[in-house]
């Protein structure tokens, strides 16, 4: 049965990852968290004191990095592994968030991650979220979504997410971090964050995760019908 690629882009803390995970499960597709991949690289750079402005050091570091996703049968979630170690919790911490935009802006890092992402999705049937999936990684994706939300709502969501991970962070600090990431993501030279011309924009400010998923699910089914793909098992 033919399957499509669903590319979900947008700003941080708009609900991309949560929505993408649920959508993938409903479609029976593979979920690929590209944000976790860049966070893993950032974590490695922090742990090994890699100078991100030194091309030789960056290249050597990338050759030592192996990222994989492993399904946790107990939690029914996909967890991120860096060089064989589960880093799912560590990469979500604030100190990594403060580094990830800087690291992800490095051309060689993006090139290496994009190659890995394209390899992971070569058989299609994936839901992938990030910053440049629909514009750079898979410009030919059958369905492209671009998610936005109010800044303060995004900050509150991120604060709640961190609280659930037992991290108490002031809301103003989170707003500053998000504003900084937005600026770096939209102004970097290599694959900046932008909405693809054929992407559906969804404002998640006032809608629930369930409503987000239902909205994209309806668009996905409509797209598959348009392409005359089999949707009996969805």
Swiss-Prot record:
Pfam family, any one: Cytidylate_kin
Please provide the record's keywords in A-Z order: ATP-binding, Cytoplasm, Kinase, Nucleotide-binding, Transferase
Question: What InterPro entries does the record point to?
Answer: Cytidylate_kin (IPR003136), Cytidylate_kinase_dom (IPR011994), P-loop_NTPase (IPR027417)
- List the disulfide bonds in this chain: none
One GO MF term: dCMP kinase activity
Catalytic activity annotation: CMP + ATP = CDP + ADP; dCMP + ATP = dCDP + ADP
Single Gene Ontology BP annotation: nucleobase-containing small molecule interconversion
**Binding-site residues, ATP:** 10-18
**NCBIfam families (alphabetical):** cmk
**What is this protein identified as?**
Cytidylate kinase
The major lineage groups are: Bacteria, Pseudomonadati, Bacteroidota, Cytophagia, Cytophagales
